[in-house]
């Protein structure tokens, strides 16, 4: 959607919601475009039907964004702990490389506490036996640690919204000069 107008992107978003609802029987609760525009998250927020948007690789925890009167929860995706790196130069060459990277990432996040580790998976890549074994080994490793929760993005969004509800603050950049000086 890099060069798409907001009107085209909105029409496509509405059609995708309609089609998903028709096929699945309910509307989608989250959105991941993957090749989004500068308008994608704002348009999703304005639509108002998504618990979360995943079009961000900006953090290890969910966060809120504001668009006018619309608040949108973002549950970040990942490009580093992602099996797509099997298909790119300087990526993972073996299942063992993938396992070691996931393990190292997990160990840091687990030590920090209260973090989310997203792992990007694609059937055509992770579905190979040696790679699938590496994923199975990593899941067993992570599961051997106390307090680890394997959750869907919807579960993460629900938990984050319940425990970290969005609070709006006055931003100096949005204040009049008089208000800014008075504060």
Question: Predicted segments — roles?
Answer:
Residues 1-2, 81-83, 123-126:
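A short, flexible beta-alpha/helix-coil linker loop
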Residues 1-14:
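Glycine-rich phosphate-binding "P-loop"
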Residues 3, 38, 128-129:
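Loop/helix-junction capping segments adjacent to catalytic residues or to phosphate/diphosphate-binding pockets
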Residues 6, 30-31, 128:
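A generic secondary-structure micro-motif detector
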Residues 10, 34-35, 132:
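Short alpha-helix boundary/capping motifs
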Residues 18-22, 26-113, 161-169:
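Active-site-adjacent pocket scaffolds in enzyme catalytic domains
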Residues 99, 103-183:
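C-terminal domain-boundary segment and adjacent tail
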